[in-house]
């Protein structure tokens, strides 16, 4: 009985992780312009970008200042924190941020939905360009990293992990605020359509 439940749980978890209809699927469509490990990183960044952008669009403007507790980031601050990281972290591995950006204060710079979405979009474009610009030969190169040492390969892994952490945070926020993630809505619609077809 326990084995059966475990198998069902694994299937449900796996299906939930698969790209739904309408989502970016770099595992199938590829990552033009990059190869090897950088291609694997690019795929994860592309998926994160797609989900962040769709979630940011789905959150109503009046919810952008919502936060689950007084001492944590709001929706706006999470999205802008991710934007700042897409510049700051890639700058640490060799791709400077565009001049004129106030990265130290960007997180609290605005609560305007349209401006935040534009900032988030631009930051992911920068991140993808930075990955393309990295030579494969530099992946094992040692570098200073938060008071210690890391390789550029390890730094990219850190960046992917950081983005995933805040994507999960944003998904939890959206559920608490009564917003169903768009890809879940898509999956639910597809499931309902299949159920309706099976009854015909």
Predicted segments, located by residue:
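Bacterial N-terminal signal peptides
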Residues: 7-20
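Cleaved targeting-peptide boundary
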Residues: 21-31
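Short, contiguous alpha-helical
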Residues: 24, 42-53, 63-104, 144-200
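Solvent-exposed, charged/polar functional surfaces in cytosolic regulatory/catalytic domains
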Residues: 51-54, 58, 122-130, 169
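Acidic/histidine-rich alpha-helical segments that form the ligand environment
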Residues: 108-144, 151-163
């Amino acid at each position: 009985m326990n084995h059966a439940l475990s198998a069902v749980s694994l299937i449900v978890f796996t299906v939930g992780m698969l790209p739904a209809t309408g989502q970016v699927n770099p595992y199938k469509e590829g990552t033009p312009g990059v190869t090897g490990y950088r291609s694997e990183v690019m795929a994860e960044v592309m998926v994160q970008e797609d989900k962040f952008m769709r979630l940011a669009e789905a959150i109503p403007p009046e919810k952008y200042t919502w936060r689950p507790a007084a001492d944590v980031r709001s929706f706006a601050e999470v999205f802008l924190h991710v934007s700042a990281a897409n510049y700051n972290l890639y700058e640490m591995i060799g791709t400077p941020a565009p001049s004129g950006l106030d990265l130290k204060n960007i997180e609290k710079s605005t609560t305007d939905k349209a401006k935040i979405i534009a900032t988030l979009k631009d930051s992911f474009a920068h991140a993808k360009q930075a990955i393309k610009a990295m030579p494969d030969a530099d992946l094992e190169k040692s570098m200073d990293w938060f008071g210690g040492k890391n390789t550029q390969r390890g730094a990219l892994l850190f960046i992917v992990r950081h983005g995933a952490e805040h994507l999960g945070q944003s998904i939890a926020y959206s559920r608490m605020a009564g917003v169903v993630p768009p890809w879940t809505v898509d999956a639910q619609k597809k499931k309902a359509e299949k159920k309706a077809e099976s009854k015909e």
